[in-house]
């Protein structure tokens, strides 16, 4: 049975197995299952800065060059609760809706909390301008290394580079998903995501993500913000793979849309309009998150 309560300035949702907490702006501050951390945390057990699910439009690849010179990247947003946490005694579920504002995009997340530790995140993106990607980013705790996914694979693929990739179920590790380009760039997208399982064998914990709607994902142990530059500055920054530091946490993107690659690395064709991120309208996917031992 779900119990919701206010602890100081935080709202807590808990039952005998799991706990989630949010601050008064709607940002997640804690998420545990059977006492085990799901997201990357500080030494005191609170979710680390940038680890909670948040809007994330960060990406940089050589093909983008001047095409995205004026399209900035953000990995955080301002949020507020627009529908307070409410429990439905008949179903035993609780709901809450959070609204976020980021550069060129407003979004809402309608949370549904179930008694069995399942959490639905019905997320609607309402862009007002150009972005490099429309989606959520988060950082999973150290140890979520083993990956099984039902999407296009086994190699990375993008909205304009996916017809040669099979839709199927694949297994790998986060480390094995690295693509060492000459210069660090955004990598590892997998389109048409249906289900993603991340396993932490040391803790005996698995997080399952099921998707209703359009989505893609990528996973990495490297902090993408270290090579994000606007415009065509990518090659002006003398960064190599050996300059990067592998982090213990897992940096995850679950996107509704990521801009296609195009062919502009050598002054070729830019991304076709149908593969650019939408700049208007409402675009929704639902993520169903379920931790299991």
Give, region by region, the residue ranges found by the protein language model.
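Beta-strand/loop-rich accessory regions of lumenal/periplasmic or secreted enzymes
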Residues: 9-10, 14-293
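Positively charged, low-complexity/disordered segments
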Residues: 1-8
């Amino acid at each position: 049975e779900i119990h919701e309560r206010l602890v100081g300035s935080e709202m807590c949702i808990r039952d005998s197995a799991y706990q989630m907490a949010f601050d008064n702006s709607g940002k997640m501050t804690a998420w545990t299952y059977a006492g085990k951390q799901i997201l990357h945390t500080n030494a005191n057990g609170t979710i680390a800065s940038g680890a909670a699910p948040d809007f994330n439009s960060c990406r940089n690849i050589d093909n983008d060059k001047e095409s995205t010179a004026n399209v900035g990247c953000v990995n955080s947003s301002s949020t507020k609760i627009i529908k307070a946490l409410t429990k439905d005694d008949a179903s035993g579920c609780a709901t809450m809706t959070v609204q976020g504002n980021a550069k060129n995009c407003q979004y809402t997340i309608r949370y549904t909390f179930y008694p069995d530790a399942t959490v639905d995140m019905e997320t609607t993106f309402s862009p007002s301008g150009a972005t490099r990607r429309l989606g959520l980013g988060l950082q999973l705790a150290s140890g979520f290394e083993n990956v099984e996914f039902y999407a296009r694979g086994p190699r990375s693929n993008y909205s304009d580079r996916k017809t040669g990739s099979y839709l199927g179920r694949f297994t790998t590790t986060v480390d094995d998903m690295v693509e060492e380009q000459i210069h660090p760039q955004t990598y590892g997208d997998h389109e048409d995501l249906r289900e993603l399982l991340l396993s932490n064998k040391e803790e005996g914990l698995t997080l399952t993500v099921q998707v209703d709607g359009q989505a893609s994902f990528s996973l990495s142990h490297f902090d993408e913000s270290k090579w994000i530059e606007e415009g065509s500055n990518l090659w002006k920054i003398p960064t190599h793979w050996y300059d990067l530091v592998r982090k213990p946490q897992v940096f995850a993107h679950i996107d509704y849309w990521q801009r296609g690659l195009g062919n502009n690395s050598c002054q070729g064709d830019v991304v076709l309009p149908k593969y650019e991120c939408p700049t208007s309208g409402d675009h929704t996917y639902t993520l169903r998150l379920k931790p299991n031992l």
